[in-house]
Amino acid sequence: MRAALVTTVLAAAVFVAAGSAAADVGPARIARAVRSAEQSRSLWATVNICDTRKYRNDLGVRGQMPTLGFAASMFMVVQVDFWSQAQHRFLPIQSNLATTRLSLGTNASGLQQDGAVFPFSAHTGLLNATVTFIWTRGGKVIGQTVRRTTAGHTDAAHSSPPRYSAAQCRIT
């Protein structure tokens, strides 16, 4: 009986502590956490698949985003862009097939990665992607930032070949 009472008291203490920790997430803490995540070197987007034998005429885009130190839902919106010879810059491909929204779940710690593979026809040309990283809490956006794909992220999961990371992809 005494053991059951001690267990109940400990469980109640843990519940109260968890509730007060959640209550400590005020606007100032949220702003600091979002600013830190936005400036983090762990926040990136990369091309991890580019027209390989296994992924013929495919573009793979992967992103990584840090958590905020408290529970927040995390999303990435991936928009594939093409090189415009006329405008000498990358422009968004105007098709629902070139945009996807990825949910990375609700997390409080660590780094989260996800990605998407986009099929194209041969001779599409030079592509990259713009990724919008979004943190929400209670259904409201608390942070959002944008990155273009860059090279050098050899820890990108599911790369083909392994450790492949590039800023752009040419579909030939």
Tell where the protein language model's regions lie, with residue ranges.
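Hydrophobic/tyrosine-rich beta-strand signature of extracellular beta-sandwich/beta-rich modules
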Residues: V80, A129-F133
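Solvent-exposed serine/threonine-rich low-complexity stretches and specific carbohydrate-binding patches
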Residues: F90-N107
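Bacterial N-terminal signal peptides
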Residues: V6-A17
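Short beta-strand elements
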Residues: R137-T172
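Contiguous beta-strand segments within globular domains
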Residues: D51-M65
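Short coil-to-beta strand junction motifs in C2/discoidin
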Residues: A72-V78
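Proline/serine/threonine-rich low-complexity linkers at boundaries of modular beta-sandwich domains
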Residues: V34-S42
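Aromatic sugar-binding surface patches on proteins
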Residues: G105-A116
